[in-house]
Amino acid sequence: MATDGASCEPDLSRAPEDAAGAAAEAAKKEFDVDTLSKSELRMLLSVMEGELEARDLVIEALRARRKEVFIQERYGRFNLNDPFLALQRDYEAGAGDKEKKPVCTNPLSILEAVMAHCRKMQERMSAQLAAAESRQKKLEMEKLQLQALEQEHKKLATRLEEERGKNKQVVLMLVKECKQLSGKVIEEAQKLEDVMAKLEEEKKKTNELEEELCAEKRRSTEMEAQMEKQLSEFDTEREQLRAKLNREEAHTTDLKEEIDKMKKMIEQLKRGSDSKPSLSLPRKTKDRRLVSISVGTEGTVTRSVACQTDLVTESADHVKKLPLTMPVKPSTGSPLASANAKGSVCTSAAMARPGIDRQASHGDLIGVSVPAFPPSSASRIEENGPSTGSTPDPTSSTPPLPSNAAPPTAQTPGITPQNSQAPPMHSLHSPCANASLHPGLNPRIQAARFRFQGNANDPDQNGNTTQSPPSRDVSPTSRDNLVAKQLARNTVTQALSRFTGPQAGAPPRPGAPPAGDVGTHPSVGRTSVKTHGVARVDRGNPPPIPPKKPGLSQTPSPPHPQLKVIIDSSRASNTGAKGDNKTVASPPSSLPQGNRVINEENLPKSSSPQLPPKPSIDLTVAPAGCAVSALATSQVGAWPAATPGLNQPACSDSSLVIPTTIAFCSSINPVSASSCRPGASDSLLVTASGWSPSLTPLLMSGGPAPLAGRPTLLQQAAAQGNVTLLSMLLNEEGLDINYSCEDGHSALYSAAKNGHTDCVRLLLSAEAQVNAADKNGFTPLCAAAAQGHFKCVELLIAYDANINHAADGGQTPLYLACKNGNKECIKLLLEAGTDRSVKTTDGWTPVHAAVDTGNVDSLKLLMYHRVPAHGNSFSEEESESGVFDLDGGEESPEGKSKPVVTADLINHANREGWTAAHIAASKGFKNCLEILCRHGGLETERRDKCNRTVHDVATDDCKHLLENLNALKIPLRISVGEIEPSNYGSDDFECENTICALNIRKQTSWDDFSKAVSQALTNHFQAISSDGWWSLEDVTCNNTTDSNIGLSARSIRSITLGNVPWSVGQSFAQSPWDFMMKNKAEHITVLLSGPQEGCLSSVTYASMIPLQMMQNYLRLVEQYHNVIFHGPEGSLQDYIVHQLALCLKHRQMAAGFSCEIVRAEVDAGFSKKQLLDLFISSACLIPVKQSPVKKKIIIILENLEKSSLSELLRDFLAPLENRSTESPCTFQKGNGMSECYYFHENCFLMGTIAKACLQGSDLLVQQHFRWVQLRWDAEPMQGLLQRFLRRKVVNKFRGQVPPPCDPVCKTVDWALSVWRQLNSCLARLGTPEALLGPKYFLSCPVVPGHAQVTVKWMSKLWNGVITPRVQEAILSRASVKRQPGFGQTTAKRHPSQGQQAVVKAALSILLNKAVLHGCPLPRAELEQHTADFKGGSFPLSIVSSYNSCSKKKGESGAWRRVNTSPRRKSSRFSLPTWNKPDLSNEGIKNKTLSQLNCNRNASLSKQKSLENDVSLTLNLDQRLSLGSDDEADLVKELQSMCSSKSESDISKIADSRDDLRMFDSSGNHPVFSATINNLRMPVSQKEVCPLSSHQTTECSNSKSKTELGVSRVKSFLPVPRSKVTQCSQNTKRSSSSSNTRQIEINNNSKEEN
């Protein structure tokens, strides 16, 4: 159409488009019609249609006038009458187009110009339309997003409500369950008390029965002793009669023989032969027989000890037990009885004292018994005792002695026994004494074994085993006549008879046991030789108590002589008595070693042939040690385990141990710990009688045991530890004690190797060669050190053994001790001054040996043990326990002590080139390698002969150790820069905190170092912000907060290595290890970004407020300009505001603006005029005529709670909200002139209020500011204290987090719980002005191991801060008249006695529930500190009486009705009261509860007051008159808080009587022992939703029953445990019959901002 028509015309005037047209064309090309909506397309179509119509109209009009205009334009000026005009026309027509110029304007050009203009306008309109469409599109998109967000918000709100409902149900259910469980706990506690009472009664009865049983046992023992005494007397009398009968029979026989001889003599006389010689022969024979077979019953009266009631130990043994005879009272001036006398050596006991308990063994009465050899006519078996008489027994005609051996006589000179102190001792058996019987042994041998052990484990007549009962107080000569001694003597008799003469061809006599059993179960014969001058003892002296019966006397045994037995070379049976008095507690060094007492008196020679010389017995009283049984010490040899080297027993191939059962009561245990191994001996009699397994079958074969020479016997005795036999052999003359066997082992070597200390002592005292070496060059000291027998080593060193003797292979005693890991031997050798540097032929040192076995203790001794000063070895040993503690860390003394060994010894290489470090590293002994590495001179780079270093041969663990050998441990610290002065609340913040120690090795690169620093920081931030060891749960807030505080490695501003700055990722030419060593960097400091850089990372780390919240606070200040921070006192408002101001200042300065911070402290006298001057002087408030300033002003108003916000800021609210010249405000200056001012945009105003919530007229200011509330139960305050104390603990432990069981963690948890519980209780009391922020608890001391410091700090905090605030808050609430002043209630200057009682009750409850509960100190220690806490000794009886006694006198039958007098409405902003409902419809519930309270008050009034304060000792009338409405309401709240467990904040208090500690002076108030003692049942009540503080209290009279309140549990004060059941029943009855609702108005509502 118009466009087409226009396009048909020639485009003569179209010129190229300019830049604007090109831009429009480009915008048009970018315009996309496809993206337009339908409405937009319609609008676009309508616009374009209008443009087209306009163009068409213009074109049509121009066409209509085209011709006329053309003619008029072209020819209008010409006239036909003018020829010049025609010429001009011809000229124009004839000239060319380029040469001719138009005479007039061409209309087509005008049209084209118009069309071009329209086209440009069209493009411009299209661009504007596209922009409008894009804006419209964005608007629609934002609307859609807003709708989606609104829908999502609604869904979340709905879900939140559902979750709240569910949580509410769960909480109610948990509360109900807690109450049920509390009831069950009380019931179980009551049951437990009953059971414990019954248990105590049963214990008393049991004790009484035990005492009666002990009395019965004593009586039975006495009766048994009497019976034994009578039986012994009867046996003695019977034996005497039998002896007399035997004498008579013998005498009759002699007479008959004499008659026969006389008859023969008569016949010979008749024959005429000479009868004189024949007369003398019978006389000699008679004399000889009288001497040999007669029994001297007249000289020495003997008595039997054996009891007829004793059981036979083995049924297969048909030989009855034989009695033991003894002389009762030998005369001191006459010779001792030889055959029946017992040689006794009673040694000292190591661990006994006179008067020891009844379990003492009878071993104190057992000495060394050397029996005489019985003649043939005196060896007879009797059931109740051996017969004594002059007639030989026809059944025992064969003597056990050789036929040529005459019966020995006993003509001994008189020896006065020496009395020696012999206290009772415990008898200990050898290790194998309790082994089970071997089934292959002869029953007789088994019976003999039990007989040898009968001193401690023999069964009595009732089959019971008595554990070594104490012996009776008997005469000195009769105390050692025991059955076991008789058995031992006969065993020695039979064994020694084999040593001294042949027995071949001697058949056993009939009725006697076989010869093979002689040594193990001998037949005890009586060999009594007549002596002269011994007085007869009367029968009234009681015999000794048998060893199987408990003694009657509890007094210590009197001294009796210790007998030393000597057998003379004349073979006479001599038993001399000689005593060796030794001190009981004398150390080994104080005793004479190897003393021998030998009787050298000449004995009358017998007319019988002489026997070979018999060895005399040398008995030395052993030093202090383990008291061993008399029958168990003759053989102590348990065989050591067979190990290579020096561990083979000496002469073990031909070892024959001679069975000598001479009773030797030693006071030490010769068996060392290293040689006593279980199962070392497989013979039952080795430990009991000294027999070796190879000897047993020889003794059972009936013939004599084949014996080697005396030197070999000496070695065998020394190897087996047979002290008795060894002492006998050492007393022989001409015996070579230094004789060596084939292996070169001497007797001393064998004894030292097997650890027989007594044998070593005997040999050394006998002057054995101490340095005699075997064929391999090992000395006794080498053997003892190798086997670990440190007592033998000590003895050998004392006898000047060569401690540096080297064997053929170069092994020294120290080397052998280190090789076998014998720590005690090493210590003894080192203290003796041995050389540590002696090397073997292979080049090994003792250090090599110790490391080769991996023995850490041996290596420590070698490296650090110093030779002690003379006389101080004991103290050195005691102090060594902590010197070598590898785990000591920084406190280990090993780090302070220097090694003793030199670097040459540590680095010494063996034949293969290996040092001790090579050996330890190759075997993986990391501990040994670590000890070696501590030596400063260790060369870890030394190579062996294969060119390998220690690192090359090391295991993986040891390689890691070597790599960290020279690592530098440099502490890493975090610094937050300079802390501002303490008036900003930052006095408890620390500038620097050590978080860890970095290990920098030689091969550490800078990349590794950067990663280590970053990882250490990340780990530290996560550690302090996580809930790792915090076991405390949040008891006030259910929402979970982000534990991360927002710090990371990106928060670092700079890092300094010592004094050199460094950044993460930066590298130097030197390695980190070289760099640290060169610059001597002692620490690495990380500086966090702070306000100076416009960041808040350092503020976050210093205050533990999450970084995200601090950034949010800064955004609010920048956006709204007017922000006030408010919260409880101590919530760090001032610190937060100041740090935000610093950060904002540096940000503005970085942007190019000048900035200034103006700080003003507001007090009660701070006026509005002063504030106006502050605003004007700081250029924050400028006149309207003045132009705005570019300077940024930050004003901080602190402590606004001290002034009235409405009065102070009322005139500034509108200008602050609308900062422009359009809303000015007129202020009057001091000169009376008024001027208009306004706040400019570059002014920031921040304020702080130390108040939990606003009240009264201050609420009018709320809408004009942006408020940031710092609640104690929400972030950031909720977790701030937890994070701060956790960082404090981590810093105290040098970057380590202690385990939860650590006392420091428990102390910190307690401090945190005190703050939470305290605020929770104060919030429940409705006293928000007393709430505390975490600032006061930031100074909690963290002292490991000293929880008392924290308790003392808590007492100071309680007395100085908490108590005054609580007291002021309670008094302000309990006061009758409220002052609406500044939103705070003030108490009266002189509170009444009732108000004082309420305050002290509140303090007592808070102290017990919030502070003392959960204290980590034990109860005893805590009670010592409770006196430091004020207000903890208030009697709760006063509080409990308020429930019923604070009402008016006229209202005795019901609860106090609500008072709606006009005084309750005196002020609009007065605090709401806790009203009671109208009681017109009271039921049984009120009467029941009232009666219950009256009964309880009556019982509690009997209790004494817990304080002497006159103001607290109130009588009932005073309480009735003092209680106001507010006081009663507060008391009821205290009452509910004291007893209720339904609140979430106190639900964690344990149900135990120790949790609520009531402190009184008398301790006679069980009614206040615990709050859980009373059993509660919930009473359903309905409450009104808590009203905000600015609402009036008139709603208490109206019937507004919004059912949004939470049901509460009716509770009472604690009652005694005895009244629990009654209270619970009354509560149930009252709760079941009441419809009363308690409407309660809580003024502690939370403000919604």
Curated annotation (Swiss-Prot):
One of its GO terms (molecular function) is protein phosphatase 2A binding. PANTHER family: CTTNBP2 N-TERMINAL-LIKE PROTEIN, FILAMIN/GPBP-INTERACTING PROTEIN. It comes from Aotus nancymaae. It comes from the Eukaryota. Keywords: ANK repeat, Cell projection, Coiled coil, Cytoplasm, Methylation, Phosphoprotein, Repeat, Synapse. Residues 119-276 form a coiled coil. Residues 411-422, 583-593, 1639-1649 have a biased composition (Polar residues). Its main location: cytoplasm. This is Cortactin-binding protein 2. It is found in: Cytoplasm, Cell cortex; Cell projection, Dendritic spine. Interacts with CTTN/cortactin SH3 domain. Interacts with STRN, STRN4/zinedin and MOB4/phocein; this interactions mediate the association with the STRIPAK core complex and may regulate dendritic spine distribution of the STRIPAK complex in hippocampal neurons. Activation of glutamate receptors weakens the interaction with STRN and STRN4. The lineage of its organism: Eukaryota, Metazoa, Chordata, Craniata, Vertebrata. The modification Asymmetric dimethylarginine is found at residue 498. Residues 368-379, 386-396, 1624-1638 have a biased composition (Low complexity). Residues 1-23, 366-440, 454-478, 499-616, 872-897, 1444-1482, 1616-1649 are annotated as: Disordered. Regulates the dendritic spine distribution of CTTN/cortactin in hippocampal neurons, and thus controls dendritic spinogenesis and dendritic spine maintenance. Associates with the striatin-interacting phosphatase and kinase (STRIPAK) core complex to regulate dendritic spine distribution of the STRIPAK complex in hippocampal neurons. The keyword Cytoplasm applies. GO terms for cellular component: actin cytoskeleton; cell cortex; dendritic spine; FAR/SIN/STRIPAK complex.
